[in-house]
Amino acid sequence: FVSDFYSTYLDVASNLFPNAKIIIDRFHIKRLLSVNLKNKRIEVMKTFKKYNFPYKVLKRYKKLLFKNFNEISIEYKAFKYNYNKFHSEYDVLNYILSIDEELEEIYWVYQDFIEAFDKKDIEGLREVINRDYSMFSISVQTTFETYKKYEEYIINAIKYIYSNGIVDGINTKIKLLKRVGYG
């Protein structure tokens, strides 16, 4: 049974299908932590004025935070707006992470989590989930409490290939057709 983190679905599934393996959809697992990283980036951006250099860098290169660290380029690249201090994606990322300490910490937790998840490293994932996150914001703490609560189902997402992505895609197309077809 594949579901998101909605506890009612999980309770119903465990009661109606006692022998079923419950799996949290991989998209929802990754999204929960990536939303925390995105919100922290926005929070840091709001501490600067719109025309300050850090604000512009955080706004323009936000996708670097979500890119796998192993895929960050260290090769020379020309950047727009004469950002002469940057010579590669790695330089930009280092600058972004130097702006705020908690943003950097959340970034590395995100990278550890995604790496363990993508490599299907169950022990590594358990280690990341069970770390102490008391020094982080409430939203990050809540995220990892949720991960701890549903750890078995998250591990099942690694073990089994099932996903509800196809069903979600069909539902999205149906909603789009209904919206476009009206009027």
Language model region names:
Residues V2-N19, I23, F27-R31, K50-G183:
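Acidic/histidine-rich catalytic cores and adjacent linkers
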